């Protein structure tokens, strides 16, 4: 059986590891969650034991849903007497996207109506609504015209642990605290005799989660503890209630899981060493922290001290982990000076320890002055955060000399990069953009385009793609090298990346624009995400990366239009537009390119997303010749030819010379009502409007195909919409 476990964005691959460690047969990451292969007992084990999950959703039905009537009918078709007992309470959570139903609360209401009406018609006492503590919580996901209805086996958001007695401003949610500790390798450090220090502990979330983690206490023991049980009783001894009273819930299996978890908790709490230290300048925050630690049963393992970061608590452990959720949001204003003082204090007091610091941005992370070995991005609610891991705080090779200061020119470039990062941040979060252009020759003396690529799996590293424009012959070679080194130094400083994470290329302009070629031959591919599709990119081995970032909005538009339709992509390159159309729900795709290298790459992209087979055809052919011979019909066609190409296997192609012939052949393949998107990046291109008007209607739509990150270079491509 396949079920879904949701999580905060950025934790997907950590959750895959946890799910597999807890006994699931299989797990595949997707955006903000994991698809899990396993039985009901596996799902209930995750409810009890997962430290990272937000919800565990057990599917009841999936059905086509074109409108509210289809939603009602699909829900009403289920045998609800087998799921809900007479008189139970009910809640429905809904998440909707697309055009079928646009209001989540209305969708939830229709689901509730269908359940209630079905039970009433069966002569069963109707359930009442309890949105806070229902007996049965249902979850509706409505996306791309398809509804999935599930039971929320946990009954509530799993980041709630049950021990939080006193909330505190800007507290890190418990499942995010667990992710920080896992990224920091805290359990291994504890097993080796190390300690844990949080110099800005607030209400104690990181320390309490750290103690419960190494004490082997299941999060569900306190979450579902009987509230009528005496509070002073150990979490390992309190009665544990059912998380859900859904009729399908396996009560016997749950009780066995709880007994085993309680035995492990007794043993772990008895052996827990007092090696956790927390400090905060706010006495009220520490009062909340101690109350929370007492409720969790770990107050004897944590030492709390009122102190600012200038006076870190003394630690006796020779090695350990520093964790910290430094202020960064509107409730606790971010202060780069505070981050700088934090970095100074850690270098002074615990230089040999490992540090895992949650920062609000790369700029704030840079302010610590610490060199990150690893860098991760995740979301704390709607806030995008950066986690840096420094191991150790002060690398041995740098203790004597310290960090190298940026030159005046490099500092100027760094300031511009930081300004651009900040300018794009709200747009990126709102649009879900993870790969973007951050700089495009903003400063004339640093003439380069810089793109950011966010890895979505593994360590979630950042990679930078720096394309240096060839300098005029009048610029001395020494100045060219100096400016190049200054720009690269600025890139590494602002984004806190190693040399190995920066790809540098110099573009040479010729008749056909930049030509493809091989470079480093590192064979280093990694995965990124765009519009919900996983994509394979390589920043080092070719001039281009496998993903043309400037076409991002056009790909999104075509994917939305291709739902349920036939999509054709000629000159398909690595097939990104085809893959995104397939993921969005295209009925079929055809991708044509002459290059076997790119078609193999395209195949890999389809496989990454679980797509392929006869519905998604790949054709190795000269695109123009293939179009003129093809007899199939397509609803949406994408044609993005190169400016110029030559090959031993095909005639030379020149977009200015051949575009009318190309467009005539492509338009002939359109179904009635079909559309063709034609785009190219030849700056001097002139569409032969009169010739095209003989066989198609045409409208230039270039402005709406340029996103904010390419607003400095609005002529990076031009795009026309054609139809018959």
UniProtKB/Swiss-Prot annotation:
Task: Kindly list the cysteine pairs connected by disulfide bridges.
Answer: none
Entry's EC annotation: 2.1.1.173, 2.1.1.264
Q: Give the stretches traversing the membrane.
A: none
Please give one Pfam family short name: RlmL_1st
| Family as reported in the entry's similarity comment | Belongs to the methyltransferase superfamily. RlmKL family.
Provide the function of this protein: Specifically methylates the guanine in position 2445 (m2G2445) and the guanine in position 2069 (m7G2069) of 23S rRNA.
Q: What is this protein called?
A: Ribosomal RNA large subunit methyltransferase K/L
Q: What is the lineage of its organism?
A: Bacteria, Pseudomonadati, Pseudomonadota, Gammaproteobacteria, Lysobacterales
Q: Which gene encodes it?
A: rlmL
